[in-house]
Amino acid sequence: TLPYLFIPLCVLMEKIGLIEDARAEISEAINILKRVSDSNSPNTPSNDNFSKKLALNICGTVPVVYGFGIYRAVAQRLKQQFNENSKVPAKWEFFPELNHNEIVGWERAGELARCFSVLFIRDDDEPEVIRQRIETTKELISKESMEIFEICGQGRRRLAKMLSTVVI
């Protein structure tokens, strides 16, 4: 249902001048969502299915979702999907804020860190400063033996990128 909520919002934002071409945003998002849905469908074998592989790898852990910029809301939504659909506790944080306090918690987590899996929402066009923060954060927390995964936004436009990460 989430994509359907965005379409009227895109049209409205175009009418008030916040975006230039709502049709292009929506069209690309639909195409990307079809591709992502097909490649992650229940009929797609696990070795070719990102969603299934991710689910198998994070099973039995508490998912921690990290986002930035446009993916801040996506991180929160994924956390809510874990809670609602998978019936597991989860948490989310966002860059750059998470680098202030979150890292200290991981440095002191010890064996408890093994109970968590960290999902970084990434983007090929992410700002260099964010890329550096993500890579540094991955280095710091990988010392704690946690499972680390990346979910990369697909497409060129913001709507497609955001929705492609939500539907995994």
Task: Describe every region a protein language model picked out.
Residues 1-168:
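A SIS-like phosphosugar-recognition module
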